[in-house]
């Protein structure tokens, strides 16, 4: 009767092993979940100010802000670099922008009529020559 008692004990040990494996897997998945949460928290964390002014390869990849500014050249802040162009003074009072639309179109229409008359004369000349 002793042998049957030992067999169930060994079967219990074999049953305990898979449960220990699953607990190890649970621990591993929990660690991965923590790492994922940490990565996400770093992703959504605002970028910190970096005072490093070096543009070497090591410093360009130092942090996310350095990579964006130095590596990619993206600057989100405006430092007044853009200057507005001064308004142009009108040098000639009779420039094309001062003329009304009807005056400009009136001047361009006679040119079209002249082209049409030239085309008509060319067509008549070709027609007679043949």
UniProtKB/Swiss-Prot annotation:
Phosphothreonine modified-residue sites: 85, 89
Chain segments carrying region Cysteine-rich: 50-66
Chain intervals with Basic and acidic residues compositional bias: 109-118
Assigned keywords, A-Z: Activator, AIDS, Host nucleus, Host-virus interaction, Phosphoprotein, RNA-binding, Transcription, Transcription regulation
Its job: Transcriptional activator that increases RNA Pol II processivity, thereby increasing the level of full-length viral transcripts. Recognizes a hairpin structure at the 5'-LTR of the nascent viral mRNAs referred to as the transactivation responsive RNA element (TAR) and recruits the cyclin T1-CDK9 complex (P-TEFb complex) that will in turn hyperphosphorylate the RNA polymerase II to allow efficient elongation. The CDK9 component of P-TEFb and other Tat-activated kinases hyperphosphorylate the C-terminus of RNA Pol II that becomes stabilized and much more processive. Extracellular circulating Tat can be endocytosed by surrounding uninfected cells via the binding to several surface receptors. Endosomal low pH allows Tat to cross the endosome membrane to enter the cytosol and eventually further translocate into the nucleus, thereby inducing severe cell dysfunctions ranging from cell activation to cell death. Through.
Gene: tat
Gene Ontology terms: biological process: positive regulation of viral transcription
Post-translational modification Phosphoserine, affected residues: 94
Organism of this sequence: Human immunodeficiency virus type 2 subtype A (isolate NIH-Z)
Biased composition regions of type Polar residues, renumbered to the chain: 11-28, 92-108
Highest taxon above the source species: Viruses
Quaternary structure and interacting proteins, as annotated: Interacts with host CCNT1. Associates with the P-TEFb complex composed at least of Tat, P-TEFb (CDK9 and CCNT1), TAR RNA, RNA Pol II. Interacts with CCNT2; the resulting complex is unable to bind to TAR RNA.
Keyword Transcription: yes
PTM summary: The phosphorylation by CDK9 does not seem to be important for transactivation function.
Location of the region described as Core in the Swiss-Prot/TrEMBL record: 67-77
Cystine bridges: none
GO cellular component, one term: host cell nucleolus
One Pfam entry name: Tat
Protein name: Protein Tat
Compositional bias annotation for Basic residues: 79-91
Recorded domain comment: The Arg-rich RNA-binding region binds the TAR RNA. This region also mediates the nuclear localization.
Record motif Nuclear localization signal, and RNA-binding (TAR), residues: 78-90
Organism classification: Viruses, Riboviria, Pararnavirae, Artverviricota, Revtraviricetes
Region ranges (Disordered): 1-30, 78-130
Localization (cell): Host nucleus, Host nucleolus
Family indicated by similarity: Belongs to the lentiviruses Tat family.
